[in-house]
Swiss-Prot record:
GO terms for cellular component: tRNA methyltransferase complex. The lineage of its organism: Bacteria, Pseudomonadati, Bacteroidota, Bacteroidia, Bacteroidales. The gene is trmB. It comes from Bacteroides thetaiotaomicron (strain ATCC 29148 / DSM 2079 / JCM 5827 / CCUG 10774 / NCTC 10582 / VPI-5482 / E50). This is tRNA (guanine-N(7)-)-methyltransferase. It is an enzyme of class 2 (transferase). S-adenosyl-L-methionine binds at E51, D76, N103, D125.
Length: 252
């Protein structure tokens, strides 16, 4: 029989590789691990990679297995979902994986300048009504700059045409260096081991016949970021925990 939410929360509170700091608990309180993840938790100087909005954490666990010479931190506010990946990685004895339960809106509170090498955004909510909530908006890019290494890598993997299109416009508006881009990942030349890791929700989109889109780009430290001023067609479908929530056909 599966565990209920309260049992999962109790597990998470006891796991040594889980850090729980929701917004309500860290308001103006410094995070002791900031700037010390390498020496105090991972015990090495390997690159740190974040997955923001990790859901169940399958992608982080998959990457951690694939790259023992990198450190991975999965971030989400939903502890009951993260429990799946946190439990799997603990039972597997993985030492290069951690989980941070917090609000992504305050992500810069947990990492020092240059402490993170890469960011993965896997099937993030496209937030079609409000640009400042999108994890690829300039609002968040400014946050990422506070802890990402110069020219650090950002990966976007999404089912949402809206999110993909918006991100392309954001990249173009700011002339950010793009390393790879495709509107149909599994029919492109880049289906390598990393990108073939499939999350629970990704498989749902594939089963519904949706193409998976992918962009890999770099974020320089210099330059004032400009938010794109364009109208983008909204996604016509409803997906897990997502809806247009609006009668509009386009949004900025």
């Amino acid at each position: 029989m599966g565990k209920n939410k309260l049992e999962k929360f109790a597990d998470m509170a006891s796991y040594p590789h889980v850090f729980e700091y929701p917004y309500s608990a860290v308001d103006n309180v410094p995070f002791d691990m900031k700037g010390k993840w390498h020496q105090e938790f991972f015990g090495n100087d390997h690159p740190i990679v974040l997955e923001l909005g990790c859901g169940r954490g399958e992608y982080t666990v998959g990457l951690g297995r694939m790259f023992p010479d990198k450190n991975f931190i999965a971030v989400d506010i939903k502890g009951s979902r993260m429990w799946t990946g946190a439990t799997e990685s603990l039972q597997a004895g993985m030492k290069n994986v951690a989980f941070l339960r917090t609000n992504i809106e305050i992500i810069e509170r947990f990492f020092a300048a240059g402490e993170v090498s890469e960011i993965w955004l896997t099937f993030s909510d496209p937030q079609m009504k409000k640009a400042t909530k999108r994890l690829t908006s300039t609002y968040f890019m400014e946050r990422y700059r506070k802890f990402l290494k110069p020219d650090g890598i950002i990966h976007l993997k999404t089912d949402s045409n809206f999110m993909f299109t918006y991100t392309k416009y954001m990249i173009e508006a700011n002339q950010l260096p793009v390393e790879f881009i495709t509107e149909d990942l599994y029919h492109s030349d880049l289906v390598d081991d990393i990108l073939s890791i499939k999350t629970y929700y990704e498989q749902q989109w594939l089963d519904r016949g949706l193409n998976i889109k992918y962009i890999k780009f770099r974020l320089p430290q210099e330059g004032v970021l400009q938010e794109p001023d364009v109208e983008i067609e909204l996604d016509p479908y409803r997906s897990y925990n997502r809806s247009k929530r609006s009668g509009l056909q386009t949004s900025k």
